[in-house]
């Protein structure tokens, strides 16, 4: 998920992460160190991007899914952006100056930037955008991104002053990098309480990004066209068609037929896809992980010993080798090996596969088969639950079936339910939390902060869908926000990872690879572990 293609938020300008390359076989596949593009960029053409998930809306203050984020990154501009090496670069911002020991930032924005309707983007738009989540009437789920923000003030037509309540590295790497600047002249009179449902977000989005919104045929596609007035130069592509496809099988079939020509191919299909005509595949480690989330609102999962037993009962190595054909790495914590904050010198609790031990742990927690029906029970209640995942993600659907089979061996009844993406997002979001357990994934942010997902304050207003609560972890995560020294920050997070791994609010399954299929004649592409369509305005189709 994202999230955000969602979802976790990040800190320092100096961030440089080691990228682990995983080259795929075949003459037409490559890794992210592929040779540089040759030839002069050429204008024209339509790139057809395949997406299993359909966007929900086009406003970064409210969206929580990767599909929406993909479109937002093309429609809007941001004060900063993160490059392919995960370093922060200026974008709309001409300069950023830290003041008062990190408690304020003076931001000067570029002049002459225009929204798609021709109106100039000024400090008024920046102040308006950042004022929305500060309002008591704001109902979005991104509030934690701006918790540190005290105020945003206009200092001049092209200058803004951000004041913080406390030092927080998240502000520089997340609040500036992930907030799409909105047009005040269009939305300024809309009550904040009504802003999320405003038709602007779905029918008439106006940004200042490289592409302009043309149309959205729900269930079919979103069409974008090049912005001739984009402040960093007109895109080479004339149009981008973002095509919504029901599932991965259909997407791979459309990729082979040429109905789409850009798609993140599932691990189960990339070896087949690399044989398709007129395509090439770039493979590299994704900045993400896949997990099973246990809803602790459900009595079944309140006891951490039960959650530990569930993880112990699952053969994650087998899942990686059989479902993914070995194309992944077993995960134990909610952090990617790409991150400088990934703990390399500590041994976190892993709860490795041991069916006998899992049964013993459940028995100690009071779960036994008292009536001989093959299903564990406690106080007259069977250990039975529904495991949900999103429709169209073939790998997750397969994982759900494997989990069902493996847990059956220890006396747990699992019913699988495949749910359309936008419906699943609504079900798991506050105030619904309508799930027992779910197979999902987080697309990590470029700064390793677990606050938004695991802090208890984020249960009712953020991304802590599983109702995880640990007072010690809460304190550590909050304290870490004010730490700017990376070594000290990592030291603090060693304790956080230990506690999360011990509590198992998630069963961390694996770290995946990305396999980006694209036209063989696509030039200008650079692999980005976070954004599939990174710098799409600089891509072109050689003729």
Swiss-Prot record:
A lipid is attached at residue 24 (N-palmitoyl cysteine). Residues 1-23 form the signal peptide. The keyword Chloroplast does not apply. InterPro entries: Peptide/Ni-bd (IPR030678), SBP_5 (IPR039424), SBP_5_CS (IPR023765), SBP_5_dom (IPR000914). It is a lipid-anchor. Keywords: Cell membrane, Competence, Lipoprotein, Membrane, Palmitate, Peptide transport, Protein transport, Signal, Sporulation, Transport. The keyword Ubl conjugation does not apply. GO terms for molecular function: peptide transmembrane transporter activity. GO terms for biological process: establishment of competence for transformation; peptide transport; protein transport; sporulation resulting in formation of a cellular spore. It comes from the Bacteria. It is found in: Cell membrane. This protein is a component of an oligopeptide permease, a binding protein-dependent transport system. This APP system can completely substitute for the OPP system in both sporulation and genetic competence. AppA can bind and transport tetra- and pentapeptides but not tripeptides. Belongs to the bacterial solute-binding protein 5 family. This is Oligopeptide-binding protein AppA. It comes from Bacillus subtilis (strain 168).
């Amino acid at each position: 998920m994202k999230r955000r293609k969602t979802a976790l938020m990040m800190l320092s300008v100096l961030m440089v992460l080691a990228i682990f390359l995983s080259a795929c076989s075949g003459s037409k596949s490559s890794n992210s160190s592929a040779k540089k593009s040759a030839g002069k960029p050429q204008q024209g053409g339509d790139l057809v991007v395949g997406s299993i998930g359909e966007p929900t809306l086009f406003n970064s203050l409210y969206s929580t899914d990767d599909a929406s984020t993909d479109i937002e990154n093309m429609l809007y501009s941001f004060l900063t952006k993160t490059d392919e090496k995960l370093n922060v670069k200026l974008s709309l911002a001409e300069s950023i100056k830290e003041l008062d020991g990190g408690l304020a930032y003076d931001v000067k924005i570029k002049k002459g930037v225009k929204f798609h309707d021709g109106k100039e983007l000024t400090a008024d738009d920046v102040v308006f955008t950042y004022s929305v989540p500060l309002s008591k009437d704001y109902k979005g789920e991104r509030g934690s991104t701006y918790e540190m923000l005290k105020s945003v003030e206009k200092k001049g037509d092209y200058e803004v002053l951000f004041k913080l309540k406390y030092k927080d590295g998240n502000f520089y790497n997340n609040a500036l990098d992930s907030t799409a600047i909105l047009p005040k002249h269009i939305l300024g009179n809309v009550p904040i309480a009504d802003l999320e449902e405003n038709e602007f977000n779905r029918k008439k989005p106006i940004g200042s990004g490289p592409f302009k919104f043309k149309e959205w045929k729900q269930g079919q596609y979103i069409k974008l066209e090049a912005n001739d007035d984009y402040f960093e130069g007109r895109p080479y592509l004339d149009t981008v068609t973002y095509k919504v496809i029901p599932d991965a099988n259909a997407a791979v079939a459309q990729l082979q037929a040429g109905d789409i020509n850009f798609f993140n191919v599932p691990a189960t299909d990339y070896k087949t896809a690399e044989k398709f005509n007129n395509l090439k595949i770039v493979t590299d480690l994704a900045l993400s992980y896949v997990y099973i989330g246990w809803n602790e609102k459900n009595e079944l999962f309140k006891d951490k010993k039960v959650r530990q037993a569930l993880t112990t009962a699952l053969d994650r190595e087998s899942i990686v080798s059989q479902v993914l054909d070995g194309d992944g790495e077993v995960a134990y914590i909610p952090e990617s090996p790409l991150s400088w904050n990934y703990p390399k010198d500590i041994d976190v609790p892993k709860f490795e596969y041991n069916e006998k031990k899992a049964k013993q742990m459940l028995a100690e927690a009071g779960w036994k088969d008292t009536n001989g029906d093959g299903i564990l029970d406690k106080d007259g209640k069977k250990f039975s639950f529904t495991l949900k995942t999103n429709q169209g993600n073939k790998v997750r659907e397969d994982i759900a079936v494997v989990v069902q089979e493996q847990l059956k061996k220890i006396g747990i009844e699992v019913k699988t339910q495949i749910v359309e993406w936008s419906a699943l997002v609504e079900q798991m979001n506050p105030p619904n939390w309508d799930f027992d357990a779910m197979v999902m994934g987080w697309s990590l942010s470029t700064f390793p902060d677990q606050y938004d997902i695991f802090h208890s304050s984020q249960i009712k207003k953020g991304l802590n869908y599983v109702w995880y609560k640990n007072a010690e972890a809460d304190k550590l995560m909050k304290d870490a926000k004010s730490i700017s020294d990376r070594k000290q920050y990592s030291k603090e997070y060693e304790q956080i990872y230990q506690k999360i791994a011990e509590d198992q609010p998630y069963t961390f399954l694996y770290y995946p690879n990305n396999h980006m299929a694209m036209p063989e004649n696509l030039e200008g592409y650079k692999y980005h572990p976070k954004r599939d369509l990174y710098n799409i305005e600089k891509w072109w189709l050689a003729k």
